[in-house]
């Protein structure tokens, strides 16, 4: 099994959050209050609870706000490094940009605006057992038509990335959490904008020497794209429908958290 202490977490928080304007003019999307805490708090607490210690925040927009809030990470039991993009590099470029700051051979990469209940330890175990080069978290959704789908075979290997369609071949969608071998990250082009979804993954899939697997579950998942998502996500966190170790035991309508 993979010891989580030998895994880096990379959180992509570079986006401007234009769908959330005017909310995001004052703060980057991952810093918006969600159930009384900055949204990113919930993800960082899940990373810490999984036993991962070293976190790299890949930022571009209002980067100083993150460091002012989380500092070196010690309050959360983490060691946080900050890597700032001089210009937006996209999801793939944001991963490639942190390569020099990785401490380990395995990196768990998180899209910073997803609220998820996936079991990170289980996903790591799956990645190790499969001897996978890249593992994507795939979540089953009731109506996949709003999303691009990802098909897998009986062995868990990813077979195709399918654009949005009215007739999806599967209910599995890319849930925005990935595990990469460091060697794969080092192959991503640097210094330019790269999309992990549109460029990196299709290229890896076309390479017979690379094993790309899908870790499939049906846990809580929400892409926090719109103001409505923040309202619903906050309510789900407060009610315990969306799990967050940051809200230790304080469930129901009345709750408090450590200031």
Task: Identify the function of each model-found stretch.
Residues 1-11, 19, 25, 33, ...:
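Conserved N-terminal catalytic core of the sugar/cofactor nucleotidyltransferase
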Residues 52, 104, 131-132, 209-210:
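Short, high-confidence coil segments that cap the C-terminus of an alpha-helix
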Residues 68, 117-192:
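Conserved core of the sugar-phosphate nucleotidyltransferase
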Residues 32, 108, 177-178, 194, ...:
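Residues that recognize and position ribonucleotide moieties
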Residues 1-6, 114, 122, 129-130, ...:
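Left-handed beta-helix
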Residues 59, 84, 111, 136-138, ...:
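Short loop/edge segments at beta-strand edges and connector loops
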